[in-house]
C-alpha cells in the first residue's frame, strides 16, 4: 500500500507542472486513443519513448513512477496471463493439458501489458504535476458547453477533485489499520489464498467507517461555508491557456499522426 502514488500531487516548477490542466486532460484523452492504435512493436516503443521524455520533463525520478507499478502488479499480471491463454488463434508455442498459448496470444498479451504500464505512467504524470483543484476546474471548463443539455459540469469536477484528494488519504488509513492489525498478531501473508483474503476483512469494516466519517465531516464543512453548487461561484485563480499549452497539444497530435503512420505503414 505504501507504493500507491496515483492521486498524489508533488509540488514542482517543471514545464509539465506549468502546463494548463485542460491541455493535460485533453492530451490524456488523446493518449488513450493512441493506446488502442498502438498494436505493434514500433508504435509501443514510440509511446514508451514519449512517456519517458515526459517523465524527464517533470523532474521527478523514473524510479518514483516505477514504484507506483508495484501496487498494480497483481492486476497487470492477472490480465496479461489471462490474455495469453485466452487467445487460441495462431501457431501453438506451448501446450499443457487444456492450457495453450500461441504466437498471437503472446503478442496480444504483450500489447495489453504495455497498455497497462503506459496508462498508469501517464495517469501518474497527470496527477503528480496537477493539483486536484486544478483538475476539477479543468473538467468543469471542458464540460461547460454541455451545460445547455443540463450536464452538471461543476458537480462532476467537484466529485473528481474529491476522489483524487481522498485516494492518498484512504491509502494512509489502510496502512494505519494494517499496522494496528499486525501489532495484534495478524499475518496478511500467511496461509492459502482464501485465508489471505479473509485476513483482509477486518480491514474493510474500519476503513468503510473511517470513509463515511470523513464524508460526513466534509459535507458538514461545505454546508457551514455556504456551499450551494457552482452557480455564481468565482475562483481565486483562473486558468490561463498559453503558447506552450498549444505547442504541447500540437506535439501530442504529431505523435498521434506518427502512430497512425506506423500502424498503417
Which residues are covered by each model-predicted region?
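Membrane-helix interfacial "entry" motifs
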Residues: 13, 36, 59-64, 96, ...
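Alpha-helical transmembrane segments and their helix-start/interface "positive-inside/aromatic belt" motifs
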Residues: 24, 63-73, 248
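Juxtamembrane/interface alpha-helical elements of multi-pass membrane proteins
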Residues: 72-186
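Alpha-helical transmembrane segments and their membrane-interface exit regions
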Residues: 50-60, 74-78
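Transmembrane alpha-helix interface motif
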Residues: 1-41, 47-56, 144, 148-151, ...
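Membrane-interface elements of multi-pass transporters and channels
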Residues: 37, 41, 45, 57-64, ...
Amino acid at each position: 500500500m505504501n507504493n500507491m502514488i496515483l492521486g498524489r500531487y508533488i509540488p514542482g516548477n517543471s514545464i509539465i507542472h506549468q502546463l494548463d490542466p485542460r491541455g493535460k486532460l485533453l492530451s490524456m484523452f488523446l493518449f488513450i486513443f493512441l493506446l488502442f492504435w498502438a498494436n505493434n512493436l514500433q508504435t509501443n516503443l514510440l509511446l514508451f519513448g514519449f512517456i519517458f521524455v515526459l517523465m524527464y520533463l517533470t523532474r521527478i525520478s523514473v524510479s518514483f513512477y516505477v514504484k507506483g507499478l508495484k501496487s498494480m502488479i497483481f492486476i497487470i499480471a492477472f490480465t496479461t496471463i489471462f490474455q495469453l491463454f485466452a487467445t487460441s488463434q495462431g501457431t501453438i508455442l506451448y501446450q499443457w493439458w487444456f492450457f495453450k498459448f500461441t504466437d498471437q496470444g503472446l503478442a496480444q498479451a504483450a500489447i495489453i501489458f504495455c497498455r497497462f504500464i503506459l496508462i498508469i505512467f501517464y495517469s501518474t504524470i497527470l496527477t503528480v504535476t496537477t493539483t486536484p483543484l486544478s483538475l476539477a476546474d479543468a473538467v468543469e471548463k471542458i464540460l461547460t458547453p454541455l451545460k445547455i443539455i443540463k450536464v452538471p459540469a461543476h458537480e462532476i469536477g467537484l466529485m473528481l477533485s474529491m476522489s483524487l484528494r481522498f485516494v492518498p488519504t484512504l491509502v494512509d488509513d489502510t496502512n494505519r489499520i494494517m499496522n494496528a492489525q499486525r501489532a495484534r498478531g495478524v499475518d496478511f501473508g500467511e496461509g492459502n489464498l482464501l485465508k489471505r483474503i479473509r485476513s483482509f476483512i477486518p480491514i474493510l469494516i474500519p476503513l468503510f467507517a473511517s470513509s463515511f466519517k470523513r464524508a460526513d465531516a466534509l459535507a458538514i464543512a461545505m454546508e457551514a461555508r455556504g456551499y450551494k453548487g457552482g452557480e455564481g461561484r468565482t475562483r481565486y485563480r483562473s486558468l490561463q491557456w498559453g503558447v506552450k499549452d498549444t505547442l504541447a497539444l500540437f506535439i501530442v497530435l504529431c505523435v498521434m499522426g506518427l502512430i497512425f503512420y506506423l500502424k498503417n505503414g
